[in-house]
Structures are given as structure tokens and as C-alpha cells.
Regions:
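Membrane-interfacial helix-loop segments of redox and metal-homeostasis proteins
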Residues: 2-143
Length: 143
């Protein structure tokens, strides 16, 4: 007797483009999330061990790698690439795992309303990443 019934296997279902919400697939999400976590971790380790005795203003320069890392983590967790948004494209089956113009599965966003939703989401993500990076850099610079 089966206790679990399988109605649909959601992991094998093809992803779908949703304006302002999803423009990358599973591989792109995984690579972006991993890249972001590694970049943030390496930046924190570098700050703790290499920049500890140096000037606090120099340590604030780590806001840039923090920004890139946080933005990559946001892209991975939200299934949304800001570069695809700026190009008005989406790619749910990225063969390389990053936004590339040479991808065979790259699609153009058709509607102007959809482009506007994508740009609004990208701007929000940039602001979240920037505020997180500045906050993290300030916290580490003041310690």
C-alpha cells in the first residue's frame, strides 16, 4: 500500500517565464547562489585576516565584492537575473549557467509591460544588494 501519491513531479516540470518574477532556470539559480555565497565568504575571510590592522576606509572598499555577492545570492534565490532584465531577455535553460548572448535557448521579452516589470524588479534587487553591502561593510569596518 502506497502512503504517498504522486500527482505531479514538480522538479521535472519545465520552468516558465513570469514577468517581474522569474527569468532564469534551475542551473542559473544554482550557479548564481553558489557564486554569491563563495564571494561573500572569501571577502569576509580576506577582511578578517588580511585587512585587520589596516585603515577603516580601506576596509570599506569591500562593499563592492559584497554588493556583487549579495546580488548573485538574490538572483539565485529569486530566480531573476538583472542582466537578462537589462537586455530584455530570459533564458530558462542556460547551458553555461550565466547570462550569455550566445545561448541557443535565449528568448526575447515580447511585451513592453513585461519589460517594465522586469526593470522594476531589477532596480529593487540592485537597491537591496547595495544597502546590504554597505551595511555589511560598515559592520565589518567598525569591528
Amino acid at each position: 500500500m502506497k502512503l504517498v501519491t504522486t500527482s505531479r513531479n514538480w522538479s521535472k516540470m519545465a520552468p516558465e517565464y513570469i514577468p517581474g518574477r522569474c527569468n532564469i532556470g534551475r542551473r542559473g539559480r544554482a550557479i548564481r547562489l553558489t557564486t554569491g555565497v563563495v564571494l561573500i565568504g572569501l571577502s569576509i575571510i580576506f577582511e578578517i585576516f588580511a585587512l585587520k590592522p589596516s585603515n577603516h576606509l580601506v576596509r570599506l572598499g569591500l562593499a563592492f565584492p559584497f554588493y556583487i555577492g549579495i546580488l548573485a545570492c538574490l538572483e539565485g534565490s529569486m530566480s531573476f537575473c538583472v542582466l537578462h532584465s537589462s537586455r530584455a531577455t530570459y533564458d530558462l535553460h542556460e547551458p553555461r549557467g550565466f547570462a550569455s548572448k550566445k545561448s541557443d535557448t535565449l528568448e526575447k521579452v515580447g511585451s513592453e509591460d513585461w519589460k517594465k516589470l522586469d526593470r522594476r524588479k531589477a532596480l529593487r534587487m540592485h537597491l537591496e544588494a547595495l544597502s546590504g553591502a554597505v551595511l555589511l561593510a560598515l559592520l565589518l569596518a567598525l569591528t
